[in-house]
A protein has these predicted regions:
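Short coil-to-beta microelement around the adenine-binding A-loop and adjacent beta1/P-loop entry
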Residues: 20-21, 36, 80
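Helix-to-loop junction immediately C-terminal to a conserved catalytic motif
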Residues: 54
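ABC-family P-loop ATPase nucleotide-binding domains
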Residues: 94-171
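Walker B catalytic motif
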Residues: 174-181
Length: 181
């Protein structure tokens, strides 16, 4: 990727959900380091675009191309997209009963470290960074030991996602209705 190339380039994207075409001829370029805001009416496809870019299997790409950091994003599965530096916050983050928050986030961080050729974080190093991130976001440290989003308020869910974002340090973050909850 040249410095002048966009980090994300979407060209003439068409997406179907079931029998319905939801996105028609969507094109956009997002430069690296840019803040890009996509606004539109309810039901106009903003969340669909984010979920499609993240690789959600419900959304079928019927045409167009998407390049992320110079690579064919559509050729990657959801995990490869995340490892490449793509992050999606959900409109309504799901509960994950039985999965401890600190273990879930550490696993994701270490998968990204591995994909970058970096050393995985041990529990001690990860916990130090996670505690700092939680404190900056006004989250009690005890949330790190709770199951992911289980029993969290709407605001706690969103701040928990922001903590994940801070710890993962993605190349591109799509924040879907970050103020909901």
């Amino acid at each position: 990727m040249k410095n002048t190339d966009p980090l994300l380039q979407v060209q003439d994207l068409r997406v179907d959900v079931g029998e319905h075409t939801v996105l028609k001829s969507v094109s956009l370029d997002v430069p690296a380091g840019a803040l890009f805001v996509l606004m539109g009416a309810n039901g106009s496809g903003k969340s669909t675009l984010g979920l499609t870019l993240a690789g959600h299997p419900r959304y079928k790409v019927m045409g167009g191309a998407v390049r992320f950091d110079g690579k064919d994003l559509l050729a990657m599965n959801a995990q490869e997209r995340a490892r490449a530096g793509f992050f999606l916050s959900f409109q309504s983050p799901p509960d994950m009963p039985g999965v401890k928050n600190n273990l879930f986030i550490r696993s994701a961080v270490n998968a990204v470290c591995e994909s970058r050729g970096e050393t995985a974080l041990d529990a001690f190093d990860f916990l130090g960074g996670a505690r700092d991130a939680a404190k900056r976001l006004g989250l009690p440290e005890a949330m790190l030991n709770r199951p992911v989003n289980d029993g969290f308020s709407g605001g706690e869910r969103k701040r928990n996602e922001l903590m994940q974002l801070a710890l993962l340090e993605p190349r591109l973050a799509v924040l879907d209705e970050i103020d909901s909850g």
